[in-house]
Amino acid sequence: MARLWPALVLFGLLAGCQSPVRLMPTPVGFTKGEADPFEKAGPALQTTEVPVLYATNRLVLIEKPEPLHTILPSQDLRMGIAHVRVGDETLDWETLHRMSTSDDPGERPIVHLESLEQMAVLKADEEVKNSAEAQAFFALVNKALAASHNPELLIYVHGSNNTVPRAAAQAAQFRHFMGRRMVVISFMWPSAGSLLRYLTDVNNAAATVDPFARLVELLAANTNASKIDVLAYSAGAQVTSPALAQLGAPRPGETRDAQRARLRLGQIYFAAPDIDTRRFVNELGTYVDLTDRVSVAANLNDSVLRFAAIVGRASRAGRPNLSELSTEQSAFLVDASQKMQFDIIKVDPNDIPNLPESSHAFWYDDPWVSGSVGTW
């Protein structure tokens, strides 16, 4: 316990001073002049506004004049548009484009949520066919897909110590560096937004599994997305992995091929996943064959996951201790990597310039790593 106190003190100092989201460093591939991710972005997209869709199961305290989201989970799904902007009114598109296609050393602008435009509330027992609001939301998703250069849909699932504005900003900057050519939904599960309330986040993530699984099924059933991709960061794996395992159970009489065609799961990317390694492997076996690919990006020196392993009393999938696995689990991982499009991406600070050895945010904070994420 004595060794844990310095970490607890540091976490306590940081808990009340969450920094704003700044535009992530430009991926290396975009700074060499080899490719301009915004080449196909039409005039309507050449703006500092980067709206993304959102869905949340946060309980709302009051509805008007606008919903006040709490840190409590519910079984309802709220969906709409998150209006996000990069920088303030003085930043123009030309400057943002230059910053996004070069290794400009200047201070990065803040990415901030201006407003949430709630379009629909779908109760836990309510069907889309009985909700005009939900139908309108999914029609908007289809309209966005039709206008996009990429027919796939990406769901971003944030980690712990997060807030609604932060979740929206992270999803928006990811969409921005995808050349704004992909439809992105930020799934804002009820994180308490404090490092000191990590265990609250763990409990809330568990309470969010059913709503997230439902969202994936609703998107598959009500949109024209060719594939549904998921990017889960850190404790977002505690929502995503068990939800996918739940979806891995077929409906009565459903064949595996029919299930695969119904769900249309594409690339599932776990960035620094904060979830028990053994649990992750067990759940992976229930759904990996339904996807195009499952990837885990792991830094074996990740300091955040070292702390999470102490709290959870088990190594995390983003910093795995493979000796914890049974013989059967180890054999499955080998088989999955050879036959089922599963891979572990080792993020080694010794091989990546200027990457902090203990980095947890490497997937968006490092220009060498972030370029490998945005390959959809």
PLM region spans:
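Short substrate-entry loop that stabilizes the transition state in hydrolases
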Residues: 162-167
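Bacterial signal peptide processing site
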Residues: 18-20
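Lipolytic serine-hydrolase domain surface
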Residues: 22-127, 139-140, 147-148, 168-172, ...
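The conserved beta1-alpha1 loop
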Residues: 155-159, 234
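Sec-dependent signal peptide recognition
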Residues: 2-8
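Gly/Ala-rich beta-loop-alpha elbow adjacent to hydrolase catalytic centers
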Residues: 212, 232, 236, 240
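C-terminal motif of bacterial Sec signal peptides marking the signal peptidase cleavage site
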Residues: 13-16
